[in-house]
Every structure is written in C-alpha cells, then in structure tokens.
A protein has these predicted regions:
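Active-site-proximal beta-alpha core segment in soluble small-molecule metabolic enzymes
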Residues: 4-8, 12, 24-141
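Alpha-helical packing segments of well-folded alpha/beta enzyme cores
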Residues: 13-16, 20
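Gly-rich Lys/Arg/Thr-decorated short loops/hinges at beta-loop-alpha junctions or inter-strand turns
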Residues: 1
C-alpha cells in the first residue's frame, strides 16, 4: 500500500511567508523545522527560506541545529529541547539560541556565564496552557 504524499511548492511557500510578513510587520517569524521539517526536509526548507535573515528556524536538538548550520543556514536557530551543559559551548560557538523553560535552566546559564564570561542567547519559554514546558505565569518567586 502506498501512503499519502505531501508536496511543498517552494514558490507558494515563499509567497505565503511574504504575505504573513506583510501582515505582522517587524515581528520575526519562527519556522519550525524539527523532526526533519516534519518529513519535508529541514535543510531544504531552511535553506530555501533563509533569504530572510531575520527568519528564525526552530529545531529540537543540538544535532538538528548543527545539521542546519553545517548545511549553510546562517539564520538564528532556536533549540527547543532542555538545555544540556555538555553542548552549551557548541551552542554559543554556533550562535544558537537555547530554550530556558525552568529556573534550573537559568541557574545553569548563570553558572556558565560566571565561569566562562559568555553564554548562548536565551529564549524564555512560558507555559501558555499546555502545562508541559515553560515558566508558570502565576509563579512570581
């Protein structure tokens, strides 16, 4: 049995992005390309959309981020997974953004900054209702 196929028409995708950008103004768009662009080819889609240098590509892991960077994508890349101390240097060296979703993440980043004098760019993740990941708006301490 042959399964369904999805085809991405690059020029239509580009036009859709341009329409969205015209409506949101100067707000940067985050394009989710984790899990190999949900099967559509993360590197292919990211390289095609990297004409807009303000476009931010989002992946799950440091490995996915490295695949994009090594494939020639120079745009900002955000890593969704929890911060792992063993890859923070690599994230900093490749100008990746890390996802800080818990107080422990910020404590680790502060420790890294105090010991090395640098840390990667940070994206603060707030729980918006799914109660899976992110700071709770109700917590103020």
């Amino acid at each position: 049995m042959i399964g369904p196929k999805a085809y991405i028409h690059k020029e239509r995708l580009k036009k859709n992005i341009e329409i969205i950008k015209s409506r949101i103004g100067s707000i940067n768009l985050m394009i989710i390309v984790k899990a190999n662009g949900y099967g559509h080819g993360a590197l292919i889609i990211s390289k095609f959309l990297s004409f807009n240098k303000e476009m931010i590509f989002c992946v799950f892991s440091i490995e996915e981020a490295m695949e994009l960077r090594e494939g020639g994508v120079d745009n900002p890349i955000l890593i969704f997974s929890r911060i792992q101390e063993n890859w923070l240097d690599l994230a900093y060296q490749n100008n990746f953004w890390v996802n800080a979703a818990h107080l422990d993440d910020l404590i680790l980043l502060r420790k890294i900054f105090e010991s090395k004098g640098y840390c990667p760019s940070i994206h603060l993740k707030f729980d918006t209702g799914m109660t899976r990941l992110g700071f709770d708006f109700k917590e103020r301490n």
